[in-house]
Structure formats: C-alpha cells, structure tokens
Amino acid sequence: MDTQTETLLQEIAEERRSHYFGKYRGIVLEALTGDDIGKLKVSVPDVLQDQPGIAVPCVPFAGPSHGLVAIPEKDDGVWIEFEAGDPSQPIWVGCWWGTGDMPSQAGPKIRTFVTTGGLALVMDDDKNELSLQHPDGPSITLSSDGIKLSTDAATVTLNTQGISLQGNTAVGE
C-alpha cells in the first residue's frame, strides 16, 4: 500500500474514532429552562461515558414565538444524535419508551398526547372523534354527532337535535 493511501486510511480511522453518527439512547438528567429553547442535560453512556451533555432540541415545527413544545422530563428516555458527529454538540431528536411505558390510549388509529399528570388529548380516527380528558374524569369530546361535556355528575350534549342535560344537576340556581 502506498503512503498516500495509508495516510488517507489513518485519517478516516481517526475521523471514525472521534465522531459519532446515528442515534444513541440517552436519559434526561434535567430539563434546562433558563434559555427557553428546550435544552436538556442528558446522560449518553455509549458516547459520553459518565459525563453529562447539554442537548439542543430538534423539533418538527419551530419559529419566533410559535412551534410544537413538548419537553421530556427527568428520567425520560431520549434519542440523541451529535451535530456533524461531534460529541460536544448533542441534539435530542425524540424519545423512547421502556417496556410498559406507552400511554394506554394509543394505537395505530388513535393519536394521543398525554402529560405526566394524566391530562390527555386523544384523536381517534376509528370513532372520528377528538377528546380532551382530565385524569379525574371530566372530558370534552367533539365528534361528527356534536360536542359532549362530561363529569362524574352530569353530561351536557350539544348536537343537531339541540342540547341535552343528564345527571344530578340544577339549572338556574
């Protein structure tokens, strides 16, 4: 092998040893809220060993004063990539669930956004409905039939037939 080829192979090998491409499993150590851009302090043992990294977000929609904001919490699993493969520039690009951690409302035709506290936005294509659900029971459901407001004590339904009120209620008190 000539010297030029050998040098090139050494450079490629060194580049490979010092750069990390692809996704790596990380764990959120802390959500950093001071700069208002969604940075996370993360642990990525396969790359950073026992040193934490500060990861910037990669989100599907963002701009001045608008965008999709869903910041993972402490101990959540996050997928980490590194800008241009540089381990000093981590990017969190998504999250992963451990076994049994996925919200129970989800499925192939059910899109769900659930907070840690149990507040849920559920979009069910099979039922053709959208609902906001509170973990203590109240909900608002929109469907092609109308709108339903529900609590443990009462249900109000607004549809093409009018308004119905069911439950232990007093109107006009």
Residue spans for each PLM region:
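Glycine-rich ThDP/TPP pyrophosphate-binding loop and its adjacent helix/strand module
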Residues: 168
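Hydrophobic packing positions characteristic
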Residues: 2-156
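Short linear motifs in low-complexity, proline-biased tails and propeptides
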Residues: 156-165
